[in-house]
Amino acid sequence: MLVRLLRVILLASMVFCADILQLSYSDDAKDAIPLGTFEIDSTSDGNVTVTTVNIQDVEVSGEYCLNAQIEGKLDMPCFSYMKLRTPLKYDLIVDVDEDNEVKQVSLSYDETNDAITATVRYPEAGPTAPVTKLKKKTKTYADKKASKNKDGSTAQFEEDEEVKEVSWFQKNWKMLLLGLLIYNFVAGSAKKQQQGGAGADQKTE
């Protein structure tokens, strides 16, 4: 009788384009034992419904593998290993993608349930970071060097940043000027000494 009923359900699902989810449990010593049958269908407004077709009257207590199968679409042997006990007060959570296709199922205990209750879980959109326009900055060579030396780490520059390069003459003009002054002073002193020595020689003659 049960086999005939399942055949009728499968035939009806093929006509109405609904999916039939078979939920079962098993251990190492026995074949899969049915827990329930659920019909998954898409509504005209784009949502997904899960209807309980049949819940098996079983007596179970212990740890088992849970299995889920949608013929031709989903095969999840031992998708969870958990402790089962009767009465079957569980939530059957059916996860679907953006195209309302079943991707996975899970089972969790809920003491408020009278039997296995199926619910649909849709994908949640993640948080969207606000778009921040980067400001354009101009840094001199000195700023870049100071940033690199700060805390002994390499500075990280913001995007769209321009570094103004300075020529060697612009960086070292003070040293050049100081060297030129020293050179003129030394050269002038040497010239005066030469002139003074030449005058003394003329007087001696």
Curated annotation (Swiss-Prot):
The record's Gene Ontology biological-process terms are: protein insertion into ER membrane by stop-transfer membrane-anchor sequence
Localisation per UniProt entry: Endoplasmic reticulum membrane
What domain of life does the UniProt record list for this protein's source? Answer: Eukaryota
Q: Which residues lie on this side of the membrane: Lumenal?
A: 18-172
Extract the signal peptide range.
Answer: 1-17
Membrane topology term reads: Single-pass type I membrane protein
Q: Which CDD domains match?
A: EMC10
The entry's cellular-component GO terms read: EMC complex; endoplasmic reticulum
Q: Does the keyword Thylakoid apply?
A: no
Predominant subcellular localization, coarse grouping: endoplasmic reticulum
Q: Which residues cross the membrane?
A: 173-190
Keyword hit for Transmembrane? yes
Q: Which residues lie on this side of the membrane: Cytoplasmic?
A: 191-205
Q: Which residues are glycosylated?
A: 47
Keyword set for this entry? Endoplasmic reticulum, Glycoprotein, Membrane, Signal, Transmembrane, Transmembrane helix
Q: Which Pfam families match?
A: ECM10
Miscellaneous comment:
Present with 1600 molecules/cell in log phase SD medium.
The entry's function note states:
Part of the endoplasmic reticulum membrane protein complex (EMC) that enables the energy-independent insertion into endoplasmic reticulum membranes of newly synthesized membrane proteins. Preferentially accommodates proteins with transmembrane domains that are weakly hydrophobic or contain destabilizing features such as charged and aromatic residues. Involved in the cotranslational insertion of multi-pass membrane proteins in which stop-transfer membrane-anchor sequences become ER membrane spanning helices.
Self-association and partners: Component of the ER membrane protein complex (EMC).
Protein name, please?
Endoplasmic reticulum membrane protein complex subunit 10
Species assigned in the record: Saccharomyces cerevisiae (strain ATCC 204508 / S288c)
What taxonomic ancestry is recorded?
A: Eukaryota, Fungi, Dikarya, Ascomycota, Saccharomycotina
